[in-house]
Amino acid sequence: MSIRDEIKKRRTFAIISHPDAGKTTITEQLLYFGGEIREAGTVKGKKTGNFAKSDWMDIEKQRGISVTSSVMQFDYAGKRVNILDTPGHEDFSEDTYRTLMAVDAAVMVVDSAKGIEAQTKKLFEVVKHRGIPVFTFMNKLDRDGREPLDLLEELEEVLGIASYPMNWPIGMGKAFEGLYDLYNERLELYKGNERFAKIEDGDTLFANNPFYEQAKEDIELLTEAGNEFSEEAILAGELTPVFFGSALTNFGVQTFLDTFLKFAPEPHGHKTVDGDEIDPLNKDFSGFVFKIQANMDPRHRDRIAFVRIVSGEFERGMSVNLTRTGKGAKLSNVTQFMAESRENVENAVAGDIIGVYDTGTYQVGDTLTVGKNKFEFEPLPTFTPELFMKVSAKNVMKQKSFHKGIEQLVQEGAIQLYTNYQTGEYMLGAVGQLQFEVFKHRMENEYNAEVVMTPMGKKTVRWIQPEDLDERMSSSRNILAKDRFDQPVFLFENDFALRWFADKYPDVTLEEKM
């Protein structure tokens, strides 16, 4: 098979959801269909020690949340599928955002009893900003939930995207009978030995069943007043196909996967800082680092740089240019992933995610190219942290471990580091409290460095240009610091202090990140 054909086989997507909507369970079912796991375990297995395959970090196993982003790959129906599992917890939107820069589509999992929740909305905004297709899976039909028409209406009103139901539930909870599959023009049966039936047999199968009659009425209403199906609108991120089902009972998941792969896009091009777009079918290899993860294998204390291949083909041992430094690097120790297991990879193509063994060479956002190509991809977004803590080593004798741990976790993008301009004290910035807890846990367990953390509360952060810096600008209402790139930054105690500063120094430009 040619490289061109290999690239066209790739389907790379992320699963986004609010915590507990069933993201881990549906991921397991997809891996099951891809033949990667023998049985699709559920999160309930945590009591027995059979942890969900996509949750590998110790703290994830304890809490049942996805803190990091796993990458899982499998072959199915002639396609090579790459799933990026994103952290669903509200405190990890920064890492999630970067992960969403590396995919070509998103699958949004919604709890049908709860509808669109806060984190789903935040993550959807990120996806909408990129303009990539979104496919919706309304989960947990095996339990009583909200009316399907209400769910569609809320999805459209809250998220501002048109929807098109690919199938429709016949009852739910204990009365759940199956799905009326509009797209495939068939019935999918929840009970009995037969999985599918013809639509014309529905009146016989569900004679005198009020839920079937209700489903037919709803579908008639949607046919008359609903949105039209449009593949073009789906690919433009303007219309989301909606699938109903139950990941826990593995009902409707394979139908979703089959249909999703028909419409999910091939690998996208990616823009450079100069505004050019690099075509995936370009023969020259290029890619960017969207994540760095330390200690994926605690026995080896290693670091992996996750690279999204944008164009061409990776071959083991190839030499690449690192645009940021202007230096070359050899890609010899490279892996691909199946949750916590990984394998050395000989070659991979545009759309694939590879893990490059990193000794400190790479940073999040780095561009890799070959030959005389020296372009740079658009920078990945940075979140402005809201919460801050002072941090220091508890044991002076452990300074080396302390500094190594901080350096690696900061490069990984797990937390942001600021240094007080006057005192040299370290300050950590995060978008949520849980990031601090994970940082402390990992420093102690992975680097054997206990830390003392002192809350500083919420701060309003603004960057300034180095040429505008004057240390006399620092006052009791702000802290002058520098970020890990040595850029000057002010931490204001509140919005009032920010406005006071802006009035006093009108010529100083204050910059905010996302």
Swiss-Prot record:
Domain of life: Bacteria
Pfam name, any one: GTP_EFTU
GO biological process: regulation of translational termination
Cellular compartments annotated: Cytoplasm
InterPro entries noted in UniProt: EF-G-like_DII (IPR053905), EFG_III/V (IPR035647), G_TR_CS (IPR031157), P-loop_NTPase (IPR027417), PrfC (IPR004548), RF3_C (IPR032090), RF3_dom_3_sf (IPR038467), RF3_GTP-bd (IPR041732)
Cellular component GO terms, alphabetical: cytosol
Keyword terms: Cytoplasm, GTP-binding, Nucleotide-binding, Protein biosynthesis
CDD domains in the cross-refs: RF3, RF3_III
GO MF, any single term: translation release factor activity, codon nonspecific
First-listed, main subcellular location of the protein, grouped into a coarse class: cytoplasm
Domain tr-type G residues, every copy: 8-268
Binding locations of GTP: 17-24, 85-89, 139-142
NCBIfam families linked: prfC, PRK00741.1, small_GTP
Xref: PANTHER family: PEPTIDE CHAIN RELEASE FACTOR RF3
Family that this chain belongs to: Belongs to the TRAFAC class translation factor GTPase superfamily. Classic translation factor GTPase family. PrfC subfamily.
Job of this protein: Increases the formation of ribosomal termination complexes and stimulates activities of RF-1 and RF-2. It binds guanine nucleotides and has strong preference for UGA stop codons. It may interact directly with the ribosome. The stimulation of RF-1 and RF-2 is significantly reduced by GTP and GDP, but not by GMP.
Protein's recorded name: Peptide chain release factor 3
Organism for this UniProt entry: Streptococcus thermophilus (strain ATCC BAA-491 / LMD-9)
Gene for this chain: prfC
